[in-house]
Amino acid sequence: MGKCSYRFISLQTLTPNSLLDHSPNPTIWAKPLQIGSLTLHSRVLQSPLSGVTDLVFRRLVRRYAPQAMLYTEMVSATEIHHLRTLPQVMEIDPRENPISIQLFDCRPDFMAEAAQKAVAQGAQSVDINMGCPVNKITKKGGGSSLLRQPAVAEAIVKTVVAAVDVPVTVKTRLGWDDGEINIVEFAQRLQDAGAQMLTLHGRTRAQGYNGRARWQWIAKVKQALTIPVIANGDIFSVEAAIACLEETGADGVMCSRGSLGYPFLVGEIEHFFKTGEKRKAPTVAEKLTCAQEHLQMLWEYKGQRGLFQARKHLAWYCKDFPGAAALREQLFQINSVQEGKDLLDQAISTAKLCL
C-alpha cells in the first residue's frame, strides 16, 4: 500500500490504537526531544498564531498539555527595536515553560537585538518566522519572503545564534509557490547556519491554508537534515498526528488551526504519545465552560480590547453541536462580558440536558 493511500485510510478508518501497530517505532513518541541544550519532554508543540496565542490562550493549552512546547505570537524585531517598553505579546509566565518567543524581520542586527530581549524575558528558545504568508509581513521582507532570499535567511540565523545562548529554531514553508519549492536546499542552509530545529508547514506561501498539506515534502527534509524536524499542517486530531509522523518520520508535530476553539488538542495528542491511550473528548458543556473561562480571562488580562478579541475565540468554540451556528453569530456580537456569559450559560444548560 502506498503512502498516500495509507494516509487516507489512517485518517478515515483506523483507530489510534491500531495506528500504533502500523508504526515502525511508536515508542519514540514518548521519548524526550533534544533541541540543542533544551530537552523537551513532549513531541507536541503549539504553533505561534498571531492574534491567538497570547498568555491567556497559552494558559488554557498548558492546562491540558503540561509538557508541550508553547510559543508566543510572532513579534516584530523592528517594533522591539523602536519601543521603549516591550510589547505585551512578549509577556511570559515562568509557569509556561517550556516557552519560545517567535520573531520576524529581515534585518539580522534587529533580529539579534530582539532575540537577546526575548531571552531576557524568559524565552527558553528563539524561533524565527520564515513562513508567514500574509502580505503585510512578506512586503517588508519577513515571513515566507525569506524563502526567496536564502542568503538573508542564513545571515539572520547565524547572527541570532551568535547573539543568544538558547536554541535558535526556524518555522517555514515548502517554498514561495509550486514553481519555487526549494525547501530541501533552504533547510540545509539553515541547519548549516546553526538552526537547531526546523518546523515545516507542508504548504507553499501561495497556497496559504488551501488544499492539503504535502507531508511528503516534510519526509524529504527530514531525510536531508540531522537536526529535529517538526511537521506542521493539517494536524486536527490524534489520528492525523499519528498518520503524519508515520508518513514523514518527523520528530514531532505542531498544532495550529486545530487548536482554535479547542485548546484541548495539544494535550490529547501529548497524552496519546505518552500512554498509547486516547483521552476522552470534552463534552459540549465542557467546551463551552472553557469558552466562558477564556472570555473572563481575556477581560481580566486586556480589558475592553480583550472583550473584542474574545468574540472570534468564542465563535471558534461553537461548532459540531445543535444550535452552534446561531450561538456563534450571537457571541460574535457581544458588547459585554456578562452578555457573553449569559449566552454561554444558556447553551451549557441546554447541552447538559442533551447528555
From Swiss-Prot:
Cofactor annotation: FMN
Similarity comment: Belongs to the Dus family.
Active-site residues (renumbered): C132 (proton donor)
Protein name according to UniProt: Probable tRNA-dihydrouridine synthase 1
Gene Ontology MF term list: flavin adenine dinucleotide binding; tRNA binding; tRNA dihydrouridine synthase activity
Top EC class of this enzyme: oxidoreductase
Keyword tRNA processing attributed: yes
Keywords carried by this UniProt record: Flavoprotein, FMN, NADP, Oxidoreductase, RNA-binding, tRNA processing, tRNA-binding
Reactions the enzyme catalyzes: a 5,6-dihydrouridine in tRNA + NAD(+) = a uridine in tRNA + NADH + H(+); a 5,6-dihydrouridine in tRNA + NADP(+) = a uridine in tRNA + NADPH + H(+)
